Amino acid sequence: TVYSSGIVTVDKAFTFSSANVRVQPGLSGFDVIKNFTLNQNTVVSGNAEADCNCLWRGIYVYGATTMTTDTDASIQDALYAIRAGFKNTLSIKKTLFSRNFIGIRGTDGNFFLPAFEENHFDGVGPLKGICSLEPLKTDIEAPEAYGGQSSQLITFVAYQTGRGFAGLYLANYSLNLSALPPATQNEFSDLAYGIMAYDGNITIDRNSIFSNIAAGAYFNRRTAGVLFVDRQPQGPNTFSFLGNGQAAIDFDNCVQGMQIRSEQAAAPTRVGITHTTMDGVQTGIFLDARFGGGEFFGTGTHGGFTGVKDNIIDANLGAPQLITNAGISFMDYSPGFSEVEISDNEVNLSYALGGSGSAGIAGIGLVPGSDPGPGVVEVDIHDNRVTLSNDAEVGLGLGSHPNGWIRNNSGGNATAGNGVFVLSGNSWAGIQVIAESNNNLVACNQVTALSAVTEGLLHVNRSQNGQFLRNVLDGPGNGAHFEFDCDYAEYRCNEMIDNTIGLLYDNFAVTGPQGTDSITNGNRWLGTFSVDGAVADISVILGLSEYYYRSVNNETPPSVVPTIGSMWFFPALANATADCLLDECPAPDPLAFAPAARITRLDTLVAEGLAVPSEAPYAEGREWQHWYNLWRKLSENPSLASGNTVMQDFLTGLSGSNIEALWGVQSVIRDSLVSKASFLANVQFNLDTIMQMEANILDLDSLLGLAMSPTQIALLTQQISDQDSILNVRITAQETMCGQFESQRTAAIAGLLTQLASISPIIVCETNLRRVYEIYLLTVASDLGADSSQLAELETIAMQCPLGGGLGVSMAGALHQGLTGILPNQGTCDDIEERGTQKPSKSRSSLTLYPNPNQGSFVVSIPKELTGKHTLLRILDAQGGLVKTIAVNEAHTVSLDLTSLPNGLYFLSLLGDGTIAEPLSFIIQH
């Protein structure tokens, strides 16, 4: 037994073998400046005989020195068992790290770790008190516990005695742990964090396993087997984890398996997580890009990184809510372009959390703050298998996440041929696309339910430009359920099998036309439907979203709810054809399938003011949202308005409006808060050069340690000095470049806030969207938390009826969830019994047309106040196509000869000098 007190300097090679080293608590330990070895069952621990219950400092290693542990050595009761220094070499094998605050701290520069195997980092408490060592841990950081007014930002850690904090704690270090047989892998257990790393590059290849990782007194909501945070604007850092597959469980009984955070906008974080097995987690893998403009690259097109692939996750710990509760979750609040594949994973989800929901695999965004625009795919969820049980809420989901694909998720579960399998319980949805998840594809998925699903096997809510193609929806519950504004939804060639209701439109559903009388959407109804094959409830506005079906190939709904359904569902012509958009399954990768935007009938009705009857509930808010959606579509696809006078007049009419101003904010966010390709290329080149130079210097240091002659020592010393000088110049240049980008980004945020302050909202939709934009820019875009008043504002907006509150309602809810972990309840929309069901009629118009109907000879009476030198009458057909334009100038009565037009429903609108009259409908009947 050896007793040690104070700081002992190891200034010559020294070994403890089969020793029991008792270290005086407090500021005592070892400063190693020459080689130091612990082996043969040596135990270094706090002196239990001392008259206090405090930690000792630990072993600090300095300079080009080697620290070796082996053969069942043990380090216990230290603040930092080992603190590695710049250019150290650590060889750590068969060592127990027990009851330490941190096992190995590596924050002082790169060091060698040539051997790291068969170690056990055990945090079982209670730990001793920190006592006089408190000043030595003031720079240790972790994600803040959320709730209240915090937002899981990185903050300093308060010491707790309940369990060890972290096995490895690293910063700006490139960790590379190579493969080991399962029996000799490193084990991290009973800690708040197994491995915690900030910046740098992390590669872990079948090297370590994690068990019983929970926060304990460090708060339930901040913990992970592995936490990696990329927050310094120094270039693209990387995280790669290759697990054991089915050879061993990588994460066992961990509240979170891995949380990977990208928090800087200079360059996306590269990520690849594959072949892990997780048994007993609440959230398996969490890709977190909420703060500071962070983004992820995780596909084979970027340096071989595969995203999240071939993992097996059993998520069954229904603990208090985390920021996200899912087998695999990708949360992206930034306007830049991420590219992540989540593929070939198997997730078994068996817990429910109520309000915020639990999901097998989820992509969560913050529209419109995180919308990079069309033409890109940010997350591609494909070829996965998810089983839901015990009321788990959602299988696969996109929430406020644009530009996402859910495709080819099928086969391999408890019942063959299921991508999502609802085994038991009362789930919400098999596949869910909600809350402004725009520009998405859901194709070639198979959902099977053995117990009823509440919202739908496919549930689509307030999401535009979605394509839902060739999905199989089998089992009780609504097969496909559309609600609220789902403008330009394409629901084609899906199979609804043995559902409660096969196809449901309710809650003011608007999708745009589902086919025409000559080209149908080819969906099929198979089996029996206990309520109805298809339902459009009394809330929907007719004339906007008719569904056309064929009487072949089981494409006719077996039953349609009376009255409203008969005004929504129509038989097509006898020779009608079906168009699936996608020829066959499986759906190809995103680069091979991206249908172009086009002008639809709904676009024309919106542009003409025919989309929402003026007496309909929430008419003002709904019309504003339709206008905003169309403005966005035309802004993102300017060629659509070319040669189209209706669209050109629509753009002219809204020029200078708040819609244009608010969309302008979105455009500036996309352009000014993200890094450009040329900048990324320079950052990557500099980073590659820096990493190579650092490796060269470490190699020279190794040679220096072996050098014997004065000549060799002098030569190597000079080479190292020269390389250090060049490296410092390169690092300074990199930091300067990234610093300039951050300064530009900060200035852009200030400019956007000024731009928003200049907007004077007229209706609540504009008030909400402007305020949520402001809070977004002041918090997550600036890498800051929200205060209590901002959170209260977000909650108030999020709980409004989305029809009246507009796009800001979805964005407020998503932002509140990202800041607190709590998704506010969506507000209810009143007056269900009074919801409008009329098609546009002359009783609502300031124009008068008579007689109506007739064979085509009409008289139009125009109020005097609406006529002028440039007054136009426009005739549109039932599909919204422009049939005829007539200049009426200052005439108050106009005769129309439309006898050459075929039978059908038509619309009449008037465009005057800065005034658009409310349109009316009429019928030609020969």
Residue ranges and their predicted role:
Residues 269, 338, 404, 440, ...:
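Short beta-strand/loop motifs in extracellular/secreted proteins, especially
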Residues 8, 844-850, 854-926:
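C-terminal outer-membrane/trafficking sorting elements
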Residues 111-114, 127-139, 144-150, 154-158, ...:
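N-terminal targeting or signal-anchor segments and their processing/structural boundaries
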